[in-house]
Structures are given as C-alpha cells and as structure tokens.
Amino acid sequence: MMSALFCDATHELDAIGLRCPEPVMMVRKKVRLMADGETLLVSADDPSTTRDIPSFCRFMDHTLVASETEQAPYRYLIRKGQ
C-alpha cells in the first residue's frame, strides 16, 4: 500500500527496469528542472537504488522525505533542497 505522502508528489519518475547508474542519473536530471520545495516520486526496481538514492540526496543537499524499500518496486519521495 502506498503511503499518502507518495500521493502528493509534484513530479513522478518511473525508473523500473533501469539499472545503475541510470536511475540516479535520471533523478539528477529531473530534480535539476524542479523548483526548490517541489517533490519527486521515484519508482525503481534496481536494488542499488536503496543505497544510491539516499546517498544522492545527502550529497546534493536534497531531502529524502520517505522511502519504501522492503520489496520492489521501491519508492522514494525526494524534496528538492532542504
């Protein structure tokens, strides 16, 4: 079941079927076009995203608002900026 948080995302990115490094590259490209405070819901099934997306958020100073990583497809809600 998808958390209500995920339903309110400003933007969505479907990275299902893509493998490292493609999902994070797509996230970076999409976030660059967003305004500060907007959110991005990312869906992915590459296990490396469970490590790479949180690292991307820390490194680029974005906020990982929520994540569901118990089983694929994984979901991440990223807020641009802090």
Curated annotation (Swiss-Prot):
Record bears the keyword Cytoplasm: yes
A Gene Ontology BP annotation from the UniProt entry: tRNA wobble position uridine thiolation
Active site, UniProt feature: 20
Cellular component terms (Gene Ontology): cytoplasm
Assigned keywords, A-Z: Cytoplasm
GO molecular-function terms, A-Z: sulfur carrier activity
SUPFAM superfamilies: SirA-like (SSF64307)
Subcellular location field: Cytoplasm
Annotated Pfam families: TusA (PF01206)
Domain of life: Bacteria
CDD domains xref list: SirA
Family per similarity comment: Belongs to the sulfur carrier protein TusA family.
Function as written in the Swiss-Prot or TrEMBL entry: Sulfur carrier protein which probably makes part of a sulfur-relay system.
Protein name, per record: Sulfur carrier protein TusA
